[in-house]
């Protein structure tokens, strides 16, 4: 049984808003923003706790990805409205559209020739090779790795300073492979990071398994030292639009423009401030006082939207691709496992979840019902049309009664027909057992 509610913003927020002044600063040039007397924007955000572009287990929160992409541009960025093959957003990508061989096994990619690191060093395929060597020799440390998937069954060939190819042993659907496998490739500044200590000279250590493991251990260790982020020279070598200027764990950070950024989407403000809050109430108090430029309205406070807009904020929904669900404990030692192991009970539980009412009353219509994590047809989005187990208390009651239960609304439902037959309660359930569960938060 899963409760799947589509939320409309990432990082646990429900609505986002930008102050009129802040929005102008983000969308106009610096001269115009200076006329408003505001050259910086403050936004509500959980403070990231990972900066190394190779993901690590336990550090894959959304705010980490957003933070890293502001400092390091990806091989491929995407845009749903892009007319480029594979929906690649070329202005924000370091790579051009891949050329796929006729047999579907070789992907040849050319890097932009104008991209460079913040110290002026050109971005090159050596940075691709550096990533490849670190990842393939430290697979067990990479959060995105799954045995049998990329880079397993694949090989890298560096063709020149700006061109490389990846060849697979099997042919895959190019759209899937480019958008879900090759997009994991990250360019890392080999000229600044290929070492095992702060005072060691950079060399080609990554080109041996032992060296790659030592370099990876060093970089990962530095990434775990959050208090050093802003002053560590490692993290000052970036190729994205921003550089880190200040970082206080659990409190916030400040970004300033990367003056050597090569892209067209250069920052239009002088400083971007991420401010962390202890909870929704503290954040929303800052919104109501006008203390931040970009934040969110918690779902429970959505009825205060008009008051927020009266402060000069522009309120808008921010679609988020996520679901909310109940995680069931199937462990044999769990108190309710003998019930959860019964498929018909899980089906009945799903039929007792009133997604439409939850979406309306709890989430203030900032969430919508769904059947599960697989996207629904466009004309069904936001409904339970086509869901196998819609909200249907009568059907849930009948399902339980058909399996030997005495259902008592608002009371204790007990097993009257124990056993493993089709019309019985199921294995491990005894006569008189009450159907109950413990919820953990």
Report each predicted region and the residues it spans.
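Short, well-ordered beta-strand elements
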Residues: 37-48, 106-109, 131, 164-166, ...
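Aromatic- and charge-enriched surface segment that lines or borders ligand/interaction sites
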Residues: 96-142, 159, 165-167, 283-286, ...
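Append "and occasionally in soluble cytosolic enzymes with long acidic Gly/Pro-rich linkers
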Residues: 340-441
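N-terminal lobe/hinge region of extracytoplasmic solute-binding protein
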Residues: 44-102, 133, 237
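Bacterial signal peptide processing site
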Residues: 27-29
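Extracellular/periplasmic solute-recognition and catalytic clefts
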Residues: 135-145, 155-158, 245-260, 273-337, ...
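C-terminal motif of bacterial Sec signal peptides marking the signal peptidase cleavage site
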Residues: 22-25
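Surface-exposed binding/hinge segments that line
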Residues: 147-219
């Amino acid at each position: 049984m899963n409760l799947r509610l589509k939320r409309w913003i990432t990082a646990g927020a429900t609505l986002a808003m930008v102050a009129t002044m802040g929005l102008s600063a983000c969308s106009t040039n610096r001269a115009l923003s200076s006329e408003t007397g505001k050259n910086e924007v403050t936004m509500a955000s959980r403070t990231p706790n990972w900066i190394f572009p190779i993901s690590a287990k336990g550090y894959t929160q959304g705010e980490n990805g957003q933070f890293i992409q502001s400092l390091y541009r990806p091989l491929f960025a995407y845009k749903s409205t892009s007319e480029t093959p594979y929906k690649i957003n070329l202005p924000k990508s370091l790579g051009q559209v891949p050329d796929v061989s006729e047999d579907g096994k070789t992907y040849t990619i050319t890097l932009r020739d104008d991209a460079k690191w913040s110290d002026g060093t050109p971005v090159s395929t050596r940075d691709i090779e550096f990533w490849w060597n670190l990842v393939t020799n430290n697979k067990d440390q990479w959060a995105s790795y799954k045995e049998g998937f990329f880079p397993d069954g694949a090989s890298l060939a560096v063709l020149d300073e700006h061109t490389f190819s990846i060849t697979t042993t099997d042919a895959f659907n190019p759209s899937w492979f480019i958008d879900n496998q090759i997009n994991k490739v990250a360019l890392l500044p080999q000229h600044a990071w290929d070492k095992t200590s702060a005072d060691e000279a950079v060399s080609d250590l990554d080109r041996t398994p032992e060296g790659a493991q030592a370099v990876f251990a060093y970089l990962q260790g530095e990434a775990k030292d959050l208090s050093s982020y802003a002053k560590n020279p490692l993290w000052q070598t970036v190729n994205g639009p921003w550089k880190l200027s200040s970082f206080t764990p659990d409190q916030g950070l400040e970004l300033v423009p990367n003056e050597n950024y090569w892209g067209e989407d250069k920052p239009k403000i002088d400083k971007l401030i991420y401010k962390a809050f202890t909870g929704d109430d503290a954040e929303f108090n800052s919104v109501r006082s006008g203390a931040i430029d970009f934040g969110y309205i918690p779902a429970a406070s959505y009825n205060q939207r008009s008051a927020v807009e009266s402060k000069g904020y522009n309120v808008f929904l921010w679609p988020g691709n996520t679901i909310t669900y109940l995680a069931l404990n199937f462990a044999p030692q769990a108190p309710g496992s003998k019930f959860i192991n019964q498929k018909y009970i899980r089906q009945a539980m799903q039929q007792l979840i009133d997604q439409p009412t939850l979406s309306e009353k709890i989430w203030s219509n900032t969430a919508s019902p769904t059947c599960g994590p697989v996207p629904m047809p466009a004309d069904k989005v936001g409904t339970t049309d086509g869901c196998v187990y819609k909200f249907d208390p009568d059907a849930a009651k009948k399902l339980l009664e058909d399996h030997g239960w005495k259902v008592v609304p608002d009371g204790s439902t007990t097993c009257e027909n124990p056993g493993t037959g089709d019309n019985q309660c199921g294995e491990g359930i005894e006569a008189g057992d009450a159907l109950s569960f413990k919820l953990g938060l």
